Amino acid sequence: MKRGFYVGRFQPYHNGHQAVLSELARTCDEIILGVGSAQLSHTLENPFTAGERVLMITRALTDLRCPYYVIPIEDVQRNALWAAHVRSMTPPFDTCYSSNPLVVRLFFEAGVDVQSPAMYERDRHSGTEIRRRMLAGEPWENLVPPAVVTVVREIDGVERLREIARAD
């Protein structure tokens, strides 16, 4: 059985993440999604709580034809220990999938097989761009799965982001 690990902040979960997971579902028997920086919320870079991100992901993946786990992963303040921390919080996995250079390096140094999936229209499908559009009042809904739009509206996420921006 091949179990893959895919980590991201998912602030918010978007169509680029969805495309990667659809691809991983073809090659993995199970997928572990690590919700990174789980302790962070209510900031411009991390407006959503770990629980809200878990909700976005689980609602968006209802049609994924692969069993998956969604596990919040808090940061540790020593990068050299991070891969071991992740392994202690997740089921065992064979491969880490990431395009983040630090994540790739840390898991490589920990002796884990690391593969970098292709990025899906990275210029548009990034949390930074989606949050920028939310703040600017520009359309963002087409960049995330419909289930994520619903969650963001349920939690009044755009207004939260705008209030945080005013406070800074």
UniProtKB/Swiss-Prot annotation:
What name appears for this protein in its UniProt entry? Nicotinamide-nucleotide adenylyltransferase
In terms of one coarse class, where is the protein primarily found? cytoplasm
Query: Which GO cellular component does the record give, naming just one?
Result: cytoplasm
Q: Does the keyword Cell wall biogenesis/degradation apply?
A: no
Single annotated GO MF: ATP binding
Give compartment(s).
Cytoplasm
Keywords recorded for this protein, A-Z: ATP-binding, Cytoplasm, NAD, Nucleotide-binding, Nucleotidyltransferase, Pyridine nucleotide biosynthesis, Transferase
Q: Which reaction does it catalyse?
A: beta-nicotinamide D-ribonucleotide + ATP + H(+) = diphosphate + NAD(+)
Q: Which cysteines are joined by disulfide bonds?
A: none
Keyword Transferase present in the record's keywords: the answer is yes
Tell me the domain of life.
Answer: Archaea
Q: Report the EC code(s) recorded for this entry.
A: 2.7.7.1
Q: Which source organism does the UniProt entry give?
A: Methanoregula boonei (strain DSM 21154 / JCM 14090 / 6A8)
Mind telling me which Pfam families this protein's record contains?
Answer: CTP_transf_like (PF01467)
- Pathway assigned to this chain's UniProt record: Cofactor biosynthesis; NAD(+) biosynthesis; NAD(+) from nicotinamide D-ribonucleotide: step 1/1
Q: An example of a Gene Ontology BP annotation on this entry?
A: NAD biosynthetic process
Family classification: Belongs to the archaeal NMN adenylyltransferase family.
